[in-house]
């Protein structure tokens, strides 16, 4: 049994980052709504509790409060931003609406050598004061600390920027240690989790495999399992883990909708059927999908058609496997958190969150989600340990509807063929061009890169003749969380090389453009 950290969510946009930082310290953590029952908190038996930030103000009535059980557990508690304010208010301090709001970088002075911050600093002033570069995002502030608390840090505009009760091991930070902008944020969270809470750093993917395999075997027994294999990271890792656990009791259904990347279907079959020995039913349904998409130009309509047809094809194939009792899905922890919703009780039913959602009821199958406790980076690490090729595990995100939403307007087979080849040239070039400063490929330096087919023709000149052919747009972005993104400043030499290859090798395309839009205002995908 792993030591656990309980994170109570008060509505912050970055609560997931808290859990990720804790797990990066090799300690298991879970996020639950702030209003969970006292019995749930006690049964969870955490080594410590972290209270997230949130958009509310404790100065108003009917705003979220920390369950009293948290303060009665006898374990360390860390309040972040709103979590600190709620702690201060409920334990006898005073919080007021701040007249000077703090949003962005701030430099705070650490005080009183508390166990949370002692020895942690970014620089020292000439007077010898330890200073921290942190990220603030708050309006309200603590005016008076509760009894038993001492000042831990301050800024000019926020005299009580952090506070500590060393006797009860209660701590409050007005800044956000979970974001990368707080330079020593990871060190602070590690100090709290490992030293103050005393949690054992034993959450590691190598150990997780053994635990997950044992759990799957106990859950499934001798029954058979079906998994919809898309070729994406989540379903691929789920397939590898399930096969490790139950072998031939697993059957994967791989639906090829004709909108995959170049040679992707062959690569999936080679990896799973040939290399790993997984039973895979390969269904080439491209004719059906393309027929249903004929004449459809609206992006949302295309998504719905592809999603509905996938369910139809999968259901038909799954129905043939009469001995199957379980449907496996590649649900991961962010899906679970998002499905639970903000401010919902932890005991509420969490809906399935995948492109085959709803199928368990339709097929009368039990639901199996072997990755539901893991973040994406943990899923990738697990995939490599299970023997999947790193090139597959660390591939850029690819939308469920595939090229269907990277072909603007109507989807046609010849458009898909042109785009597949252009996209493959772009990705291959990104993999082979190395950045001299970092020594990394430009594929690894970008978070997502792809080509988009534009259904417009432009005039060109090839040899002695004029051409009238299609246009392809290239898109490459860099991002930490995909909520915002910057367009990647790819070398001109790389872009020129890609353009020349596409125009020379892909007959039907005579113009290549590069998208230099950020998110916002643009989205990463074009549709």
Curated annotation (Swiss-Prot):
Matches recorded under Gene3D superfamilies: 3.30.300.10, 3.40.50.880, HUPs
PROSITE patterns in UniProt: GATASE_TYPE_1 (PS51273), GMPS_ATP_PPASE (PS51553)
Keyword Membrane carried by entry: no
Residue ranges of every copy of the Glutamine amidotransferase type-1 domain listed in the record: 4-202
UniProt keyword annotations, A-Z: ATP-binding, Glutamine amidotransferase, GMP biosynthesis, Ligase, Nucleotide-binding, Purine biosynthesis
Subunit structure of this chain's protein: Homodimer.
Name of the protein this chain belongs to: GMP synthase [glutamine-hydrolyzing]
Biological source species: Paraburkholderia xenovorans (strain LB400)
